[in-house]
Amino acid sequence: MAKKVQAYVKLQVAAGMANPSPPVGPALGQQGVNIMEFCKAFNARTESIEKGLPIPVVITVYADRSFTFVTKTPPAAVLLKKAAGIKSGSGKPNKDKVGKVTQDQIRQIAETKAADMTGATIETKMKSIAGTARSMGLVVEE
């Protein structure tokens, strides 16, 4: 018989840097999950990813206080900021441009995020990433 799901917890945790401090500790503590067990498992699973990149994670907590979790790819905005070499996007994206990204960089980001995105082809995923870039005040070079 399948375990009864008690809750789903969605967090963004830095790759390889999960620890019991907020936001991880309070979110999992409320559900009665062993926090250190999650931290060790998460850090082990994300050790191949660049340390410090925020990784969205969905934790499924069961009634017996056991858990499973699924890691996603880093947000597109974070990958775009890294590719453009900027700290943050523009406050006025239509007026103030803060950086540039090339089609090759957008293709690379789309391929990285392919598993978590909708869209039939890599080209449609690239258009989505390019739209995110424009909304951040980045110029998309052809």
From Swiss-Prot:
Pfam families: Ribosomal_L11, Ribosomal_L11_N. One of its GO terms (biological process) is translation. The lineage of its organism: Bacteria, Pseudomonadati, Pseudomonadota, Gammaproteobacteria, Pasteurellales. Belongs to the universal ribosomal protein uL11 family. GO terms for cellular component: cytosolic large ribosomal subunit. HAMAP family: Ribosomal_uL11. One of its GO terms (molecular function) is structural constituent of ribosome. Keywords: Methylation, Ribonucleoprotein, Ribosomal protein, RNA-binding, rRNA-binding. One or more lysine residues are methylated. Forms part of the ribosomal stalk which helps the ribosome interact with GTP-bound translation factors. This is Large ribosomal subunit protein uL11. Part of the ribosomal stalk of the 50S ribosomal subunit. Interacts with L10 and the large rRNA to form the base of the stalk. L10 forms an elongated spine to which L12 dimers bind in a sequential fashion forming a multimeric L10(L12)X complex. It comes from the Bacteria. InterPro entries: Ribosomal_uL11, Ribosomal_uL11_bac-typ, Ribosomal_uL11_C, Ribosomal_uL11_C_sf, Ribosomal_uL11_N, Ribosomal_uL11_N_sf. It comes from Actinobacillus succinogenes (strain ATCC 55618 / DSM 22257 / CCUG 43843 / 130Z). PROSITE patterns: RIBOSOMAL_L11.
